[in-house]
Amino acid sequence: MATEAKRPKTGDEKSVLEPLNNFLLWCESVQLTLSDKVYLSKEGTAAEYGMLAKEDIEEGHVLFTIPREALLHQGTTKVKKVLEEGKKCLESASGWVPLLLSLMYEYTSSTSHWKPYLSLWPDFRTLDQPMFWSEEECDKLLKGTGIPESVITDLRKLQDEYNSVVLPFMKSHPDLWDPEKHNLELYKSLVAFVMAYSFQEPVEDDDEDEEDDEKKPNLPMMVPMADMLNHISKHNANLEYTPECLKMVSIRRIGKGEEVFNTYGQMANWQLLHMYGFAEPFPNNINETADIKMASVYKAAAQVARSEANQQLLEDKWKMLCEMEVVGEKGVFIFGQSGSLTYHELYTTLKVLCMSSQIFEDFRENEGWEEDDEDDDDKMEQDLSFEGLASLSVEWKRLLCVAATETLDSYNEDVETDRRLMEDQRALAELSSRERRALYVRLGQKNILQRIQQLTKPAS
């Protein structure tokens, strides 16, 4: 089954084909070369725009090449000099402000070099991340997934960034930006545009000895043509970076008529929906994950710490775990399709919480170190895999089972309700695109959580 559309199909054929043809002409003018073996279309693809194979394509074939001069970012925009001069006052937590100012200028300029490219998104209506959903819809469809909380944080941050950094800078350059035209609503749309369509070049690891000098990630940039490809976890193409250009290369054989898919990385459905506005149909996403809040494991331990002495011991244990930076107030333990992905943190947490008072005192005196510590990474990973959970001690399993159950209870619907809906093809077809994507997210998470619950529940 193909992935659900990254960009829902809307509008008539003419309104889509004319901008697409203009874009292809622009590609020729900037020496963006497209292989004769592929073509762009909105028919037969997983999205309004997509790339299809005209004929069989072998592994290693270059599907298209784009020169770096055709990329859109703060170093190529017409206002790059102004942005460079104001570099200091444009610093922000996201690091996106220079790119967003570039996009605001180029998107609203009738003479922009990138106009044929940016015209593919005439009003950003195709962007459908949850940040554009109502609060009620988010809570109804996505409660428990972690997305509503992320959206609230995103909206607060972008509004603060616009008011404190972007607006003052625009007001100091009225010849280039107009706050009436380049308003918060446009800024929000462009933030979503960057989230969904930008690319970040991987940081080169030139000097492995410089461990202390951690390199900053490269800033995002817009890559025309690359963002026409849709994503699935089992992709068949990959973007490669060279000093002169970027190339999309097939990583396996692609059959005639097959869609060319890129990848955004190993992303769970909640991440895909949050950042890109789509989700892979359940159970197709091999990178699916589910989170259990660290606080839920603490609550599970608190249920059996009935005496005042035991409650104090639990608080001391948790405090030490915090000091060791193993847990945090808003932290989560992450589970994937095969078990815990944060096995070091989870193993240490379960071990400390289940220690007797004497063993914990010894542990604390040694500042978290044990002389004969046999808990290497391989053992931790195996013990907290789905193959190993059933063999854990009763105390460890109880904490995991209670925490997983609490997490499952945080959703609006139980797992069986969602599973029945997924299996009812008629009911599934009647769902809106938002309802369907939300279902894929919920069911992917619940499936993992239910497995944890089943593997750790007490023997009857």
From Swiss-Prot:
GO terms for cellular component: nucleus. InterPro entries: N-lys_methylase_SETD6, Rubisco_LSMT_subst-bd, Rubisco_LSMT_subst-bd_sf, SET_dom, SET_dom_sf, SETD3_SETD6_MTase, SETD6_SET. It is found in: Nucleus. Its EC number is 2.1.1.-. Keywords: Methyltransferase, Nucleus, S-adenosyl-L-methionine, Transferase. It comes from the Eukaryota. PROSITE patterns: SET (PS50280). One of its GO terms (molecular function) is protein-lysine N-methyltransferase activity. Residues 28-265 form the SET domain. The keyword Cell membrane does not apply. The keyword ATP-binding does not apply. It is an enzyme of class 2 (transferase). Gene3D superfamilies: Rubisco LSMT, substrate-binding domain (3.90.1420.10), set domain protein methyltransferase, domain 1 (3.90.1410.10). Transmembrane segments: none annotated. One of its GO terms (biological process) is peptidyl-lysine monomethylation. Belongs to the class V-like SAM-binding methyltransferase superfamily. Histone-lysine methyltransferase family. SETD6 subfamily. Protein-lysine N-methyltransferase. This is N-lysine methyltransferase setd6. The lineage of its organism: Eukaryota, Metazoa, Chordata, Craniata, Vertebrata.
